[in-house]
Amino acid sequence: MESSSMTTHQEEPLDLSTGNHGNSELSDEQQIMQVMESCGMFLQQNLFAWFLQSMLEASASQPQLTQDEPPENDTKENDLVKQNKSEVNDENESTPSPTQNSRRRTSTGKIDRRMVGKMCTRRYEANARERNRVQQLSKMFDQLRVCLPIEDDAKISKLATLKVASSYIGYLGAILQENSNDEEEFKKQLQVELECAKTLRK
């Protein structure tokens, strides 16, 4: 009996402890909710205060920026004045003064000699370029005549060389395409051009 009574006494405090544990859990949840609510209120207050402060700073800094920046009308007027000045300077430089004209008239001919010298050098350069171009064309025509079915010592004109070359190219193209009609036509045309080149050479 004593052992049973002791077991009952031991079990009763266990039941009491579990009940207290449930109450403690509820109290912890309530405390957490209270802390979260207080944090939320704190954040709301701080955010509102920060927003007001930033708005005040922005409104205070805006007039300073407008004071530092020059107005648009002033800048436009300054640009127009600068453009007018530059145009006037260009006109003054382009229009020769009477003193300059008199200097040109009373000069001893040095300016004219310089101009003549420049014209001569330009003419020499143009002639040299033309000679170079003609020499290059002659070389190219000589290379083309080597590829054509004409005699090596034949001297035909450049126009006749081009006509023979076009007929010969058409004849070779017809052979590659295996077109007998075009081949015969271009062959006749090539023979005609070769005969014309020979008669012109004589």
Swiss-Prot record:
One example of a Gene Ontology biological process annotation: negative regulation of transcription by RNA polymerase II
Tissues in which the protein is found: Expressed in intestine, neurons in head, body and tail, and in body hypodermis, and vulva. Expressed in neurons in the male-specific genital sensilla (simple sense organs) known as rays.
Any GO CC annotation of this UniProt entry: cytoplasm
GO MF entries: DNA-binding transcription factor activity, RNA polymerase II-specific; protein heterodimerization activity; RNA polymerase II transcription regulatory region sequence-specific DNA binding; transcription corepressor activity
Subcellular location: Nucleus; Cytoplasm
InterPro entries according to UniProt: bHLH_dom, E-box_TF_Regulators, HLH_DNA-bd_sf
Chain intervals for the UniProt region annotation (Basic motif): 121-134
Ranges of residues in domain bHLH: 121-172
Gene3D superfamilies (UniProt xref): Helix-loop-helix DNA-binding domain
Pfam families: HLH
Main subcellular localisation: nucleus
Subunit structure: Heterodimer with hlh-2.
Purpose: Probable transcription factor which binds the E box motif 5'-CA[TC][AG]TG-3'.
Protein's recorded name: Helix-loop-helix protein 10
